[in-house]
Amino acid sequence: MKKTLLTVGFVLSCFSAGMQAQIALVNPVPQQVKAEGGMLFDAPKTIKTFSDKGRSNSTAAKTLTENCNVQAKGAYCVTIGVVGDKATKKYDKLVPKHAEGYYLSISKKGAVIVGRDENGLYYGVQTLLASMSEGKLEVCTVTDWPDVPFRGVVEGFYGTPWSHEARLSQFDFYGRHKMNVYIYGPKDDPYHRGHWRVPYPEKEGLRIKELAEHAKRNGVSFYWAIHPGVDIKWNNEDRDALVAKLEQMYKLGVRAFAVFFDDIWGEGTKADKQAELLNYVDDNFIQKKPDVAPLVMCPTEYNRSWVNEKKGYLRTLGSKLNKSINIMWTGNTVVHCIDKEGTDWVNERIERKAYIWWNFPVTDFVRDHITLAPTYGNDLDIADKLSGFVSNPMEHAEASKIALYGVADYTWNMKAYDFKKDWEKAIHELLPGNAQALRTFALYNKDLGKNGHGFRREEGEELKELAADVNSGKPSAETIRQLSEKLEQLGVSCD
Protein backbone atom coordinates (compact mmCIF):
# COMPACT_ATOMS: atom_id res chain seq x y z
CA MET A 1 0.00 0.00 0.00
CA LYS A 2 1.30 3.43 -0.90
CA LYS A 3 2.71 5.34 2.05
CA THR A 4 1.80 8.99 2.47
CA LEU A 5 3.22 11.69 4.70
CA LEU A 6 0.37 13.03 6.80
CA THR A 7 0.41 16.74 7.39
CA VAL A 8 -0.31 17.80 10.92
CA GLY A 9 -3.35 19.73 9.73
CA PHE A 10 -4.82 16.55 8.24
CA VAL A 11 -4.14 14.59 11.39
CA LEU A 12 -5.93 17.13 13.54
CA SER A 13 -8.82 17.49 11.13
CA CYS A 14 -9.31 13.73 11.44
CA PHE A 15 -9.63 14.18 15.19
CA SER A 16 -12.02 17.10 15.02
CA ALA A 17 -14.18 15.43 12.38
CA GLY A 18 -14.51 12.27 14.45
CA MET A 19 -12.45 10.06 12.14
CA GLN A 20 -10.31 7.38 13.70
CA ALA A 21 -6.76 8.46 12.90
CA GLN A 22 -5.36 7.25 16.21
CA ILE A 23 -2.20 9.32 16.01
CA ALA A 24 -4.44 12.41 16.28
CA LEU A 25 -4.97 11.45 19.92
CA VAL A 26 -1.30 12.17 20.64
CA ASN A 27 -0.24 15.40 22.31
CA PRO A 28 2.14 17.02 21.53
CA VAL A 29 1.50 16.72 17.79
CA PRO A 30 4.35 14.64 16.28
CA GLN A 31 6.75 16.17 13.77
CA GLN A 32 6.32 13.50 11.07
CA VAL A 33 3.78 10.71 10.58
CA LYS A 34 3.68 8.24 7.69
CA ALA A 35 0.45 6.27 7.61
CA GLU A 36 -0.55 3.18 5.65
CA GLY A 37 -3.73 4.73 4.28
CA GLY A 38 -5.40 4.95 7.69
CA MET A 39 -5.29 1.18 8.26
CA LEU A 40 -6.64 0.47 11.75
CA PHE A 41 -6.68 -2.60 13.95
CA ASP A 42 -7.80 -3.38 17.48
CA ALA A 43 -5.30 -2.34 20.13
CA PRO A 44 -3.70 -5.41 21.70
CA LYS A 45 -5.11 -6.68 24.98
CA THR A 46 -1.73 -8.06 26.03
CA ILE A 47 1.86 -7.17 25.13
CA LYS A 48 5.35 -8.52 25.59
CA THR A 49 8.55 -6.52 25.31
CA PHE A 50 11.83 -7.31 23.60
CA SER A 51 14.99 -5.35 24.34
CA ASP A 52 18.59 -5.54 25.44
CA LYS A 53 18.93 -7.09 28.88
CA GLY A 54 19.51 -3.88 30.83
CA ARG A 55 16.78 -1.93 29.08
CA SER A 56 13.94 -3.73 30.86
CA ASN A 57 14.59 -1.66 34.00
CA SER A 58 14.39 1.69 32.20
CA THR A 59 11.69 4.27 32.88
CA ALA A 60 10.33 3.68 29.38
CA ALA A 61 10.03 -0.09 29.83
CA LYS A 62 8.39 0.27 33.24
CA THR A 63 5.93 2.84 31.90
CA LEU A 64 4.96 0.49 29.10
CA THR A 65 4.46 -2.58 31.27
CA GLU A 66 2.67 -0.63 34.04
CA ASN A 67 0.08 0.61 31.54
CA CYS A 68 -0.47 -2.64 29.62
CA ASN A 69 -1.28 -6.24 30.40
CA VAL A 70 1.94 -8.22 30.01
CA GLN A 71 1.98 -11.81 28.79
CA ALA A 72 5.00 -13.87 27.77
CA LYS A 73 3.46 -15.88 24.93
CA GLY A 74 1.10 -14.97 22.11
CA ALA A 75 1.09 -11.27 22.95
CA TYR A 76 1.72 -8.21 20.78
CA CYS A 77 5.48 -7.63 20.75
CA VAL A 78 6.87 -4.16 21.43
CA THR A 79 10.60 -3.91 20.72
CA ILE A 80 12.30 -1.03 22.53
CA GLY A 81 15.79 0.42 22.60
CA VAL A 82 18.10 3.40 22.42
CA VAL A 83 20.47 4.10 19.53
CA GLY A 84 23.33 1.61 19.90
CA ASP A 85 21.29 -1.19 21.48
CA LYS A 86 21.63 -4.57 19.76
CA ALA A 87 17.89 -5.28 19.82
CA THR A 88 17.07 -2.22 17.70
CA LYS A 89 20.35 -1.59 15.88
CA LYS A 90 18.88 -2.00 12.38
CA TYR A 91 16.58 0.97 13.04
CA ASP A 92 19.27 3.37 14.27
CA LYS A 93 19.51 5.30 10.99
CA LEU A 94 15.78 6.04 11.13
CA VAL A 95 16.01 7.81 14.50
CA PRO A 96 16.18 11.64 14.29
CA LYS A 97 19.48 13.08 15.47
CA HIS A 98 17.80 15.59 17.75
CA ALA A 99 18.13 15.09 21.52
CA GLU A 100 15.01 13.34 22.90
CA GLY A 101 13.96 12.27 19.40
CA TYR A 102 12.48 8.85 18.66
CA TYR A 103 11.31 6.55 15.88
CA LEU A 104 8.11 4.54 16.29
CA SER A 105 6.80 1.90 13.90
CA ILE A 106 3.35 0.36 14.43
CA SER A 107 2.12 -2.66 12.47
CA LYS A 108 -0.30 -5.50 13.11
CA LYS A 109 2.65 -7.77 13.88
CA GLY A 110 4.22 -5.53 16.50
CA ALA A 111 5.70 -2.15 17.34
CA VAL A 112 9.26 -0.84 17.44
CA ILE A 113 10.37 2.17 19.49
CA VAL A 114 13.92 3.51 19.30
CA GLY A 115 15.03 6.65 21.12
CA ARG A 116 17.99 8.88 20.43
CA ASP A 117 18.42 8.75 24.22
CA GLU A 118 16.51 7.53 27.28
CA ASN A 119 14.04 10.41 27.16
CA GLY A 120 13.45 9.83 23.47
CA LEU A 121 12.57 6.19 24.13
CA TYR A 122 10.25 7.24 26.94
CA TYR A 123 8.46 9.71 24.67
CA GLY A 124 8.04 7.04 22.01
CA VAL A 125 6.34 4.84 24.60
CA GLN A 126 4.03 7.71 25.54
CA THR A 127 3.07 8.16 21.88
CA LEU A 128 2.23 4.46 21.57
CA LEU A 129 0.15 4.51 24.76
CA ALA A 130 -1.75 7.63 23.67
CA SER A 131 -2.46 6.05 20.29
CA MET A 132 -3.97 3.02 22.04
CA SER A 133 -6.11 5.06 24.42
CA GLU A 134 -9.39 4.57 22.53
CA GLY A 135 -8.97 0.89 21.73
CA LYS A 136 -7.49 1.10 18.24
CA LEU A 137 -4.03 1.35 16.67
CA GLU A 138 -3.09 2.75 13.29
CA VAL A 139 -0.45 1.22 11.01
CA CYS A 140 2.10 4.02 10.72
CA THR A 141 5.60 5.26 11.47
CA VAL A 142 6.35 8.31 13.59
CA THR A 143 9.59 10.28 13.46
CA ASP A 144 9.52 12.84 16.22
CA TRP A 145 11.59 15.27 18.27
CA PRO A 146 11.09 18.46 20.35
CA ASP A 147 11.66 22.00 19.08
CA VAL A 148 12.69 23.46 22.45
CA PRO A 149 15.27 21.60 24.61
CA PHE A 150 13.75 22.37 28.03
CA ARG A 151 9.94 22.45 28.30
CA GLY A 152 7.71 22.57 31.33
CA VAL A 153 6.60 24.52 34.37
CA VAL A 154 7.99 26.87 37.00
CA GLU A 155 5.98 26.97 40.20
CA GLY A 156 6.89 30.58 40.82
CA PHE A 157 3.60 32.28 41.65
CA TYR A 158 2.68 34.23 44.79
CA GLY A 159 -0.10 32.84 46.94
CA THR A 160 -1.05 29.35 48.07
CA PRO A 161 1.57 26.82 46.90
CA TRP A 162 0.43 23.61 45.27
CA SER A 163 -0.17 20.68 47.59
CA HIS A 164 2.21 17.74 47.60
CA GLU A 165 -0.43 15.56 45.96
CA ALA A 166 -1.08 18.16 43.26
CA ARG A 167 2.60 18.23 42.34
CA LEU A 168 2.71 14.45 42.05
CA SER A 169 -0.30 14.58 39.72
CA GLN A 170 1.36 17.31 37.69
CA PHE A 171 4.44 15.15 37.07
CA ASP A 172 2.28 12.34 35.71
CA PHE A 173 0.69 14.89 33.37
CA TYR A 174 4.06 16.30 32.26
CA GLY A 175 5.37 12.84 31.45
CA ARG A 176 2.37 11.98 29.30
CA HIS A 177 2.77 15.24 27.38
CA LYS A 178 6.55 15.18 26.96
CA MET A 179 7.45 18.09 29.23
CA ASN A 180 10.85 17.54 30.82
CA VAL A 181 11.26 20.32 33.39
CA TYR A 182 9.59 21.34 36.64
CA ILE A 183 11.17 24.19 38.62
CA TYR A 184 10.25 24.29 42.29
CA GLY A 185 10.20 27.92 43.37
CA PRO A 186 7.04 28.71 45.37
CA LYS A 187 7.44 32.17 46.87
CA ASP A 188 5.77 31.07 50.12
CA ASP A 189 8.25 28.25 50.89
CA PRO A 190 10.48 29.79 53.60
CA TYR A 191 13.36 27.40 52.86
CA HIS A 192 13.40 28.56 49.24
CA ARG A 193 13.46 32.30 49.99
CA GLY A 194 13.20 33.86 53.45
CA HIS A 195 15.25 31.18 55.26
CA TRP A 196 17.31 30.00 52.30
CA ARG A 197 20.37 29.33 54.47
CA VAL A 198 18.44 26.96 56.75
CA PRO A 199 18.32 23.24 55.83
CA TYR A 200 14.91 21.67 55.34
CA PRO A 201 13.61 19.86 58.43
CA GLU A 202 13.51 16.08 57.98
CA LYS A 203 9.78 15.85 57.23
CA GLU A 204 9.83 18.57 54.57
CA GLY A 205 13.05 17.18 53.13
CA LEU A 206 11.52 13.75 52.64
CA ARG A 207 8.65 15.33 50.71
CA ILE A 208 11.15 17.02 48.40
CA LYS A 209 12.85 13.65 47.94
CA GLU A 210 9.57 12.01 46.97
CA LEU A 211 8.86 14.78 44.47
CA ALA A 212 12.28 14.40 42.86
CA GLU A 213 11.87 10.63 42.58
CA HIS A 214 8.36 10.85 41.14
CA ALA A 215 9.43 13.49 38.63
CA LYS A 216 12.28 11.26 37.47
CA ARG A 217 9.87 8.35 36.93
CA ASN A 218 7.99 10.60 34.52
CA GLY A 219 11.03 11.78 32.57
CA VAL A 220 10.98 15.16 34.32
CA SER A 221 14.00 16.99 35.73
CA PHE A 222 13.02 18.30 39.16
CA TYR A 223 14.75 21.68 39.52
CA TRP A 224 14.97 23.01 43.04
CA ALA A 225 15.36 26.80 43.10
CA ILE A 226 16.93 28.92 45.82
CA HIS A 227 16.20 32.65 46.20
CA PRO A 228 19.05 34.28 48.18
CA GLY A 229 18.94 37.83 46.83
CA VAL A 230 16.78 39.43 49.51
CA ASP A 231 19.53 39.46 52.14
CA ILE A 232 22.68 37.93 50.63
CA LYS A 233 25.97 39.41 51.89
CA TRP A 234 28.28 38.49 48.94
CA ASN A 235 30.85 37.03 51.32
CA ASN A 236 32.43 33.58 51.61
CA GLU A 237 30.14 32.65 54.48
CA ASP A 238 26.97 33.15 52.43
CA ARG A 239 28.55 31.58 49.38
CA ASP A 240 29.38 28.47 51.38
CA ALA A 241 25.90 28.46 52.94
CA LEU A 242 24.32 28.45 49.49
CA VAL A 243 26.48 25.57 48.27
CA ALA A 244 25.77 23.66 51.50
CA LYS A 245 22.04 24.07 50.89
CA LEU A 246 22.44 22.73 47.36
CA GLU A 247 24.42 19.80 48.73
CA GLN A 248 21.56 19.00 51.10
CA MET A 249 19.15 19.00 48.18
CA TYR A 250 21.50 16.80 46.16
CA LYS A 251 21.50 14.25 48.98
CA LEU A 252 17.70 14.30 48.82
CA GLY A 253 17.86 13.24 45.18
CA VAL A 254 17.64 16.62 43.42
CA ARG A 255 19.75 16.70 40.26
CA ALA A 256 18.84 20.10 38.81
CA PHE A 257 19.16 23.55 40.37
CA ALA A 258 18.16 27.17 39.81
CA VAL A 259 19.10 30.42 41.56
CA PHE A 260 16.57 33.28 41.51
CA PHE A 261 17.32 36.99 41.86
CA ASP A 262 13.87 38.24 40.83
CA ASP A 263 11.69 40.74 42.70
CA ILE A 264 14.46 42.09 44.95
CA TRP A 265 16.07 45.47 45.63
CA GLY A 266 19.36 46.76 46.98
CA GLU A 267 22.63 44.87 47.37
CA GLY A 268 21.37 41.62 45.89
CA THR A 269 20.73 43.17 42.46
CA LYS A 270 24.38 43.67 41.45
CA ALA A 271 25.05 41.85 38.17
CA ASP A 272 28.79 41.38 38.68
CA LYS A 273 28.24 39.87 42.14
CA GLN A 274 25.51 37.59 40.85
CA ALA A 275 27.76 36.39 38.03
CA GLU A 276 30.68 35.80 40.40
CA LEU A 277 28.54 33.73 42.77
CA LEU A 278 26.85 31.71 40.04
CA ASN A 279 30.13 30.96 38.29
CA TYR A 280 31.50 29.69 41.59
CA VAL A 281 28.45 27.47 42.07
CA ASP A 282 28.71 26.26 38.49
CA ASP A 283 32.45 25.54 38.66
CA ASN A 284 32.53 24.01 42.13
CA PHE A 285 29.19 22.25 42.39
CA ILE A 286 27.30 21.80 39.10
CA GLN A 287 30.28 20.84 36.93
CA LYS A 288 31.74 18.58 39.62
CA LYS A 289 28.69 16.32 39.49
CA PRO A 290 28.22 14.56 36.13
CA ASP A 291 24.57 13.70 36.85
CA VAL A 292 23.44 17.31 37.42
CA ALA A 293 21.59 19.36 34.78
CA PRO A 294 22.74 22.82 33.60
CA LEU A 295 22.25 25.65 36.10
CA VAL A 296 19.37 28.07 35.55
CA MET A 297 19.21 31.62 36.91
CA CYS A 298 16.43 34.20 37.03
CA PRO A 299 17.88 37.71 36.75
CA THR A 300 16.70 40.85 38.51
CA GLU A 301 16.01 42.60 35.22
CA TYR A 302 13.95 39.74 33.84
CA ASN A 303 11.87 41.70 31.35
CA ARG A 304 12.58 44.40 28.81
CA SER A 305 10.55 47.16 30.46
CA TRP A 306 12.76 46.95 33.54
CA VAL A 307 16.11 46.99 31.76
CA ASN A 308 18.43 49.90 32.51
CA GLU A 309 20.71 49.98 29.47
CA LYS A 310 23.06 52.56 31.00
CA LYS A 311 23.85 50.32 33.97
CA GLY A 312 24.39 47.38 31.63
CA TYR A 313 22.97 44.72 33.94
CA LEU A 314 22.07 42.23 31.19
CA ARG A 315 25.28 42.80 29.25
CA THR A 316 27.30 42.18 32.40
CA LEU A 317 25.56 38.84 32.90
CA GLY A 318 25.99 38.03 29.22
CA SER A 319 29.73 38.63 29.20
CA LYS A 320 30.66 37.35 32.67
CA LEU A 321 28.31 34.44 33.33
CA ASN A 322 29.49 30.96 32.32
CA LYS A 323 27.93 30.13 28.96
CA SER A 324 26.52 26.87 30.34
CA ILE A 325 24.21 28.81 32.68
CA ASN A 326 20.71 29.51 31.34
CA ILE A 327 19.15 32.94 31.90
CA MET A 328 15.39 33.29 32.33
CA TRP A 329 13.27 35.97 30.63
CA THR A 330 9.57 36.88 30.80
CA GLY A 331 9.43 38.95 27.61
CA ASN A 332 8.93 42.62 26.88
CA THR A 333 7.07 43.09 30.18
CA VAL A 334 6.36 40.98 33.26
CA VAL A 335 3.30 39.38 31.66
CA HIS A 336 3.72 39.29 27.92
CA CYS A 337 3.61 36.88 24.99
CA ILE A 338 6.97 36.02 23.46
CA ASP A 339 7.87 37.38 20.02
CA LYS A 340 10.81 37.08 17.66
CA GLU A 341 11.93 40.71 17.91
CA GLY A 342 11.99 40.52 21.69
CA THR A 343 13.96 37.27 21.80
CA ASP A 344 16.52 38.64 19.33
CA TRP A 345 16.84 41.74 21.52
CA VAL A 346 17.53 39.87 24.75
CA ASN A 347 19.67 37.12 23.20
CA GLU A 348 22.10 39.70 21.85
CA ARG A 349 22.52 41.15 25.35
CA ILE A 350 22.80 37.94 27.34
CA GLU A 351 24.98 36.25 24.69
CA ARG A 352 22.96 33.04 24.72
CA LYS A 353 19.45 31.80 23.97
CA ALA A 354 16.82 32.98 26.42
CA TYR A 355 15.16 30.56 28.81
CA ILE A 356 11.56 31.77 28.80
CA TRP A 357 9.57 32.14 32.01
CA TRP A 358 6.10 32.74 30.58
CA ASN A 359 3.66 34.25 33.05
CA PHE A 360 0.59 32.35 31.87
CA PRO A 361 -1.80 31.00 33.09
CA VAL A 362 -0.71 32.53 36.42
CA THR A 363 -3.35 34.70 38.09
CA ASP A 364 -1.58 35.91 41.23
CA PHE A 365 -2.17 39.51 40.08
CA VAL A 366 -5.93 38.88 39.66
CA ARG A 367 -6.66 36.31 42.33
CA ASP A 368 -10.43 36.63 41.94
CA HIS A 369 -10.10 35.11 38.44
CA ILE A 370 -9.14 31.81 36.88
CA THR A 371 -8.21 31.44 33.23
CA LEU A 372 -9.12 28.37 31.22
CA ALA A 373 -8.06 30.02 27.99
CA PRO A 374 -6.05 28.28 25.29
CA THR A 375 -2.32 28.88 25.01
CA TYR A 376 -1.80 31.45 22.25
CA GLY A 377 -0.06 34.70 21.36
CA ASN A 378 3.55 33.51 21.20
CA ASP A 379 5.34 33.63 17.85
CA LEU A 380 5.59 30.31 16.03
CA ASP A 381 9.05 30.89 14.49
CA ILE A 382 11.25 31.28 17.57
CA ALA A 383 12.11 27.67 18.44
CA ASP A 384 15.76 28.08 17.42
CA LYS A 385 16.08 31.19 19.60
CA LEU A 386 15.16 29.57 22.92
CA SER A 387 17.06 27.31 25.31
CA GLY A 388 13.95 26.64 27.36
CA PHE A 389 10.32 27.58 27.86
CA VAL A 390 8.50 27.12 31.17
CA SER A 391 5.02 28.27 32.13
CA ASN A 392 4.17 29.90 35.45
CA PRO A 393 0.75 28.40 36.29
CA MET A 394 -2.14 29.29 38.57
CA GLU A 395 -2.26 28.24 42.20
CA HIS A 396 -5.11 26.01 40.98
CA ALA A 397 -3.10 23.03 39.78
CA GLU A 398 -5.83 21.05 38.00
CA ALA A 399 -7.31 24.11 36.29
CA SER A 400 -3.84 25.01 35.00
CA LYS A 401 -3.65 21.80 32.96
CA ILE A 402 -5.70 23.22 30.07
CA ALA A 403 -3.05 25.87 29.41
CA LEU A 404 -0.16 23.50 30.16
CA TYR A 405 -1.52 21.04 27.60
CA GLY A 406 -1.03 23.84 25.08
CA VAL A 407 2.44 24.73 26.38
CA ALA A 408 3.52 21.11 25.85
CA ASP A 409 2.21 21.12 22.28
CA TYR A 410 3.59 24.57 21.42
CA THR A 411 7.12 23.92 22.67
CA TRP A 412 7.33 20.52 20.99
CA ASN A 413 6.20 21.44 17.47
CA MET A 414 5.72 25.19 17.02
CA LYS A 415 5.05 25.40 13.30
CA ALA A 416 2.25 22.84 13.54
CA TYR A 417 0.69 24.41 16.62
CA ASP A 418 -3.01 25.24 16.31
CA PHE A 419 -4.24 26.67 19.61
CA LYS A 420 -7.94 26.25 18.86
CA LYS A 421 -7.68 22.55 18.05
CA ASP A 422 -5.25 22.06 20.92
CA TRP A 423 -7.74 23.59 23.37
CA GLU A 424 -10.52 21.30 22.16
CA LYS A 425 -8.23 18.27 22.56
CA ALA A 426 -7.28 19.39 26.08
CA ILE A 427 -10.93 19.63 27.12
CA HIS A 428 -11.64 16.17 25.68
CA GLU A 429 -8.69 14.56 27.45
CA LEU A 430 -8.99 16.25 30.83
CA LEU A 431 -12.68 15.54 31.40
CA PRO A 432 -13.72 12.89 28.86
CA GLY A 433 -16.86 11.96 30.76
CA ASN A 434 -18.23 15.49 30.77
CA ALA A 435 -16.21 17.39 28.19
CA GLN A 436 -19.12 19.51 26.98
CA ALA A 437 -19.77 20.92 30.45
CA LEU A 438 -16.08 21.76 30.92
CA ARG A 439 -15.97 23.38 27.49
CA THR A 440 -19.00 25.54 28.25
CA PHE A 441 -17.59 26.61 31.62
CA ALA A 442 -14.16 27.31 30.12
CA LEU A 443 -15.61 29.43 27.30
CA TYR A 444 -16.69 32.03 29.86
CA ASN A 445 -13.68 31.78 32.17
CA LYS A 446 -10.78 32.77 29.93
CA ASP A 447 -10.17 36.47 30.41
CA LEU A 448 -8.29 37.92 33.39
CA GLY A 449 -10.30 41.14 33.48
CA LYS A 450 -8.75 44.58 33.79
CA ASN A 451 -5.33 44.30 35.39
CA GLY A 452 -2.15 46.28 35.89
CA HIS A 453 -0.27 44.23 33.31
CA GLY A 454 -2.82 44.83 30.57
CA PHE A 455 -2.82 41.13 29.73
CA ARG A 456 -6.17 39.99 28.39
CA ARG A 457 -7.60 36.86 26.73
CA GLU A 458 -10.54 36.49 24.37
CA GLU A 459 -13.68 35.24 26.13
CA GLY A 460 -17.22 34.28 25.17
CA GLU A 461 -16.50 34.29 21.44
CA GLU A 462 -19.61 32.25 20.71
CA LEU A 463 -21.83 34.95 22.24
CA LYS A 464 -20.47 37.96 20.37
CA GLU A 465 -22.90 37.95 17.45
CA LEU A 466 -25.84 37.22 19.71
CA ALA A 467 -24.82 39.98 22.12
CA ALA A 468 -24.46 42.46 19.26
CA ASP A 469 -27.99 41.64 18.12
CA VAL A 470 -29.33 42.12 21.65
CA ASN A 471 -27.44 45.40 22.08
CA SER A 472 -28.97 46.68 18.85
CA GLY A 473 -32.24 46.97 20.76
CA LYS A 474 -34.17 44.80 18.33
CA PRO A 475 -33.03 41.20 18.81
CA SER A 476 -34.71 38.54 16.73
CA ALA A 477 -36.69 35.72 18.28
CA GLU A 478 -34.01 33.28 17.12
CA THR A 479 -31.33 35.32 18.88
CA ILE A 480 -33.32 35.24 22.12
CA ARG A 481 -33.81 31.48 21.77
CA GLN A 482 -30.11 30.78 21.14
CA LEU A 483 -29.01 33.12 23.92
CA SER A 484 -31.37 31.49 26.41
CA GLU A 485 -30.11 28.06 25.39
CA LYS A 486 -26.45 29.03 25.87
CA LEU A 487 -27.13 30.64 29.24
CA GLU A 488 -28.95 27.50 30.35
CA GLN A 489 -25.97 25.39 29.24
CA LEU A 490 -23.67 27.66 31.23
CA GLY A 491 -25.79 27.27 34.34
CA VAL A 492 -25.79 23.48 34.01
CA SER A 493 -22.01 23.41 33.47
CA CYS A 494 -21.48 25.24 36.77
CA ASP A 495 -23.37 22.63 38.82
Explain the meaning of each model-derived region:
Residues 25, 91, 95-241, 245, ...:
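Feature activates predominantly on carbohydrate-active enzymes
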Residues 7-16:
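Bacterial N-terminal signal peptides
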Residues 11, 20-108, 134-142:
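Acidic, contiguous N-terminal accessory segments
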Residues 245, 252, 264-420:
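Catalytic-core regions of glycoside hydrolase
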Residues 49-56, 80-85, 114-116, 156-158, ...:
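Structural motif
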Residues 416-495:
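C-terminal functional modules
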Residues 1-4:
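Positively charged n-region of N-terminal signal peptides that target proteins for export
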Residues 183, 258-260, 390:
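Conserved beta-strand positions in the central sheet of alpha/beta enzyme cores
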